[in-house]
UniProtKB/Swiss-Prot annotation:
One of its GO terms (molecular function) is aminopeptidase activity. Pfam families: Peptidase_M28. This is Leucine aminopeptidase 1. It comes from the Eukaryota. Disulfide bonds join C321-C325.
Length: 387
C-alpha cells in the first residue's frame, strides 16, 4: 500500500520498538543471502513512465511516498489486449433477501483471532522465510474453510500461485455456471521500509486488515448452498497477493498469466487497509468507506457505491490514491475492470504502516466489519449477475 511522508516521523519509534532478530531467528528472516543487492529493476511510476533503479532506490522511493509497479518480470502486462473489457454491471443491488442472513453471520471475533495470528509473524516481507511461513498458514486457513463448508465436493479449491522470491500468492476458486470470473483481492505481505530484512513488520492494517476482511467474507459466502453448488452465473476467486509492497509483483504475475491465457475477468475489487479510523474521527468526520475514483473502472466503482449504500451501515466518501497504489492496478493494466476501497478518505489513512508500529491495537474491528459487508454484498450480487 502507499507510504506517506508522515510515516517518516515514525522512524525513531520504529527503530526503538522493533526488535532485531533474536539468535534463534537469524536463519529464518531472509531466503536470499543478500538483503539488498546491486541488481537493477525496471519500475513504472505513471503510465508509460519507466526507470531503472536498485533495490535500495526502490525503498527510498517508497519512503518518499512514490508508488510504482516493478515491471522487470512482467513488461508484457497490458500489451496483449486489444481493448479493455467493457462490462455492464447491475443497475442496483437486488439480492437483499438472500444476503440478510449471510451479513448477520459475519464475525468480528473471527477476524480478530485470524489477525492476531497473522501479525504474530516477525514480518511478512516477501523475501523472508517468515513471509513464506505466513503464506502457508494463510493457505491452510482458506483450504480449511472450503473443506469445512463441503465446497470441495463441488470443485471449490485453493492453491498457491508460485513466485521466484519465496512467498507465494494464494488463489481460492468457487466455480460458477460460466468461466467468467469475479475477483476479490487483498495483499498478504508486509514490510518495514527502514530495514525490510531485519525490522519487524506486523502489518496489521497494511494489509493484514484486508486479508482477514476478505477471508471472513469468504467464510460466510461458503455457507450459501447455491454458491458452493455452483449455481452462480459467474466463477468467484479470492486472491491474496504476495509482494505488493515490492511493486505489485504478485498481482502482476497473476494478471499477466490471465491476460496471456485469455481469462475472462469481469470485475476485481481490492481491499487494502480496512481497519483504521482514528484520524477520521479526530478530524470530526464521520466514519466512512473510502471509494477510490482514480485509475479504476468507473462503472464498477459506481456499483460499489450502491453496494455500500445498500449493505453497509456507514456511508462512503470518494477519494484518490494515485497510480499503482495497490493491486487493482495490475488488473486494470491487463484490461480488466477493477476497483479499490480503503478505510477512509485517503488523507486520513493510517500513517503507521510500513513500520513496527502497524499493530492490532490501533484497528477498529467494527469498521472492518463494514468492509466485510461490502465485500460479501458485492461478490454475492455479482456471482448471480449476467455480466
Amino acid at each position: 500500500m502507499k507510504f506517506t511522508n508522515l510515516s517518516l516521523l515514525a522512524l525513531s519509534a520504529s527503530l526503538a520498538s522493533a526488535r532485531f532478530v533474536e539468535q534463534h531467528e537469524t536463519d529464518q528472516v531472509i531466503l536470499n543471502s543478500n538483503a539488498v543487492t546491486d541488481e537493477r529493476y525496471l519500475i513504472e511510476t505513471a503510465p508509460g513512465k519507466q526507470q531503472w533503479v536498485t533495490e535500495e532506490e526502490k525503498w527510498e522511493l517508497r519512503r518518499n511516498g512514490q508508488n510504482f509497479m516493478d515491471i522487470t518480470e512482467t513488461p508484457e502486462l497490458g500489451t496483449l489486449r486489444t481493448s479493455s473489457v467493457k462490462v455492464k454491471f447491475p443497475s442496483k443491488p437486488t439480492l437483499q433477501k438472500d444476503l440478510k442472513p449471510l451479513l448477520e453471520d459475519l464475525s468480528k471475533s473471527k477476524m480478530h483471532k485470524n489477525l492476531e495470528t497473522f501479525t504474530s509473524f516477525h514480518t511478512r516481507y516477501y523475501k523472508s522465510d517468515y513471509g513464506r511461513q505466513s503464506s502457508e498458514w494463510l493457505l491452510e486457513q482458506v483450504q480449511t474453510l472450503i473443506k469445512d463448508a463441503g465446497a470441495d465436493k463441488y470443485g471449490a479449491h485453493a492453491r498457491h500461485f508460485k513466485h521466484s522470491w519465496g512467498q507465494n500468492s494464494i488463489i481460492a476458486t468457487i466455480p460458477g455456471q460460466k468461466n467468467s470470473t469475479v475477483v476479490i483481492g487483498a495483499h498478504q505481505d508486509s514490510i518495514n521500509l527502514f530495514l525490510p530484512s531485519i525490522l519487524s513488520a506486523p502489518g496489521a492494517d497494511d494489509d493484514g486488515s484486508g486479508t482477514v476482511t476478505i477471508l471472513e467474507a469468504l467464510r460466510v459466502l461458503l455457507t450459501s448452498k447455491d454458491i458452493i453448488k455452483g449455481k452462480g452465473e459467474n466463477t468467484i476467486e479470492f486472491h491474496w497477493y504476495s509482494a505488493e509492497e515490492g511493486g505489485l509483483l504478485g498481482s502482476q504475475a497473476i494478471f499477466s498469466e490471465y491476460e496471456k491465457t485469455g481469462r475472462d475477468v469481469k470485475a476485481m475489487l481490492q481491499q487494502d487497509m480496512t481497519g483504521y479510523t482514528q484520524k477520521t474521527l479526530d478530524a470530526g468526520e464521520p466514519e466512512s468507506v473510502g471509494v477510490i475514483t482514480d485509475f479504476v473502472d468507473p462503472d464498477l466503482t459506481d456499483f460499489i457505491k450502491k453496494i455500500v449504500t445498500e449493505y453497509c451501515t456507514i456511508d462512503f466518501v470518494e477519494t484518490r490514491c494515485g497510480y499503482a497504489c495497490s493491486d487493482h492496478a495490475s488488473a486494470s493494466k491487463a484490461g480488466y475492470p477493477s476497483a479499490f476501497v480503503i478505510e477512509s478518505d485517503f488523507k486520513y489513512s493510517d500513517d503507521r504502516i510500513h513500520t513496527s508500529g502497524d499493530t492490532l491495537n490501533f484497528l477498529n474491528f467494527d469498521h472492518m466489519l463494514q468492509h466485510a459487508r461490502l465485500t460479501l454484498g458485492l461478490v454475492y450480487e455479482l456471482a448471480f449477475a449476467k455480466l
